UniProtKB/Swiss-Prot annotation:
Protein name: Small ribosomal subunit protein uS12
PANTHER family registered for this protein in UniProt: 30S RIBOSOMAL PROTEIN S12 FAMILY MEMBER
Record Pfam families: Ribosom_S12_S23
CDD domains per the UniProt record, alphabetical: Ribosomal_S12
The keyword Ribosomal protein belongs to this UniProt entry's keyword annotation: yes
UniProt entry keywords in alphabetical sequence: Methylation, Ribonucleoprotein, Ribosomal protein, RNA-binding, rRNA-binding, tRNA-binding
Family named by the database record: Belongs to the universal ribosomal protein uS12 family.
Organism for this UniProt entry: Protochlamydia amoebophila (strain UWE25)
GO BP, one annotated term: translation
Length: 126
């Protein structure tokens, strides 16, 4: 343990925080181009075919991004908007694709939680 005199001479350095989404380089979102659109299987105990895309960002980095919602229209060369946010049961997937932005269409017939999937408010019947 250091003495008070040693701490006066050289104070304690604060711990550096590592970013959870370094490829975005401190931006809220980044534009990218889909290289591949595939499915991945989650970790135990879950079972599914989760839709993911390999995306080359405008920074030049390649990341794996999750495509949320039911159904999508993405294919190779689609331009997408990528935000941070990991998928807990998919190792290595630390980014999400923003639905309803650029080439990625919104989820059809979405009634609740629409803002997360880019869906417009449905017309009310009178």
């Amino acid at each position: 343990m250091p003495t008070i005199q040693q701490l006066i001479r050289q104070p304690r350095a604060p711990k550096k925080r590592r970013s959870k989404s370094p490829a975005l380089q401190k931006c809220p979102q980044r534009r990218g181009v889909c290289l591949q659109v595939k499915t991945k299987t989650p970790k135990k105990p879950n079972s599914a075919l989760r839709k993911v895309a390999w995306v080359r960002l405008s920074t030049g980095q390649e990341v794996i991004a999750y495509i949320g919602g039911e159904g999508h229209n993405l294919q190779e060369h689609s331009i997408v908007l990528v935000r941070g946010g990991r998928v807990k049961d998919l190792p290595g997937v630390r980014y999400h694709i923003v639905r309803g932005a650029l080439d990625c269409a919104a989820v059809k017939d979405r009634k609740q939680g629409r803002s997360k999937y880019g869906a417009k408010r449905p017309k009310s019947k009178k």
